[in-house]
Amino acid sequence: MKNRLLKGLALAVTMSFAAGLTLVPAQAASEIVIWADETRGPNLTKVFAKKSDWVPGSTIKVVSFSSYDALKDALDKASGTTGPDIFVAGNDWVPALAKSGKLAPVVLTAAQRAQFSPSQFFDLSYGGKLYGVPVDVNNVGMVYNTKLVKTAPKSYGDMVKFYLANKTKLGLKAGLCVAGGGMSWGGLSGFSALGAEPYQMNADGTVNFTKSFDATAFAKNVKTYLLDKNGKSNGFYPATDTGCQDNYLAGKVPFAIIGNWHWRTFAEAGFPMNIQPVPGVKAGTYGKMFGSVSGAFLTSYAEAHGVAVPAKSLLTNFFASTKGQVAYQAEEGRPPAEKGAQKSQLVLGGQKAMGAAASKSSIPQIGAFLNTNAGGANYWDSAPAYWTAVLVDGKDPLVEAKKLAAIWKANVAAGKADL
């Protein structure tokens, strides 16, 4: 998801925890204040405690919120001088915060821009202006338990066949479940592998604003792979993420979608990081995950606090640099966005595997489409609602798929103006 006096070479790095809005008092003119969530904040604090001179003459204060939602709530409520100079979060908040005037544009040199892919800047831009620097790739990936499954599945059907053949003998709780990111964000791969995505991307990386997914084909795949002969869930793919991580670690689920922020939990439990995208219905194809970047964003409050220049320097010297991203991701554990950091031998195998999975099959996370209710519901609510309707309530998958396609198509049409 400001104190600024450098006395000698000592950097004061502080943390405060907030569940809601944190009122930030006027600060010394050399202090840069960063807001982040409950995981990024503590990790940033560790990094700045080890190295203090990213911006000579400035101190850094990290304010950590109790959750990602709490960070968002605080940013929404911030006004006057109560906001941060920089915050770290996902890219889907950009349109609303840019329109509200809470973000400030960032200008990078050609050399700095060359260290990132163009699509990453798309994620952090609005109205033709860049508002942050890419920090890390934000994605999920699928792993499989090699004590149960000896080889990587080539298709969605391979996974379903294994589950149906072994669920009783092995006491399986599910076949594929979502352990990271929830049923909407983390669960996009579950939709996409069967043929449904909230927006369609053209081959050149642009958005197809007029086309939605094929509801008939998607519903057919749902019937084939997720329902039994009576139209009830066959148990392969649960409608909820509850218990997924524990069940996978206990050997009761052969395939799981995990997040790039907690892959080490599985690695430390002895599971190999055979990370890949969820295989599609056709062998050799893969379901798409959200593969956007999280960013470090410059706010308009930095100018009000008199620290716009050092805050911009922190963005480039730390957040957008090879050394900075390597140092940060040593604590955070996500795949770095910067090209030099991606190649570093200090970046762990699990991080690189997550990054490779995102490169193989992902779509950008476009908040203008995902956050709007123009179609009757936003993506975040409508996605899990589909699985509840079909897998729990027993509703017709085609009827519900047509509703979903219409909702998502309307949301894309409405969100076009916010790109």
Residue ranges and their predicted role:
Residues 131-135, 140, 159-210, 253:
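Extracytoplasmic/periplasmic solute-binding protein
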Residues 77, 84-85, 113-147, 284-289, ...:
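A structural signal for short loop-to-beta-strand junctions that line the ligand-binding cleft
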Residues 276, 329-381, 387-389, 415-419:
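Long, aromatic- and glycine/proline-rich binding clefts that accommodate carbohydrate-like moieties
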Residues 267-333:
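Extracytoplasmic/periplasmic substrate-recognition and gating elements
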Residues 4, 8, 14-15, 19-21, ...:
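Conserved N-terminal structural module of periplasmic/extracytoplasmic solute-binding proteins
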Residues 206-238:
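Glycine-centered hinge/linker elements that transmit conformational signals in sensory
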Residues 71-83, 99-100, 161-169, 242-256, ...:
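Short helices/loops that flank or line small-molecule/ion binding pockets
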Residues 91-139, 151, 156-160, 276:
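Hinge/lid segment of periplasmic solute-binding proteins
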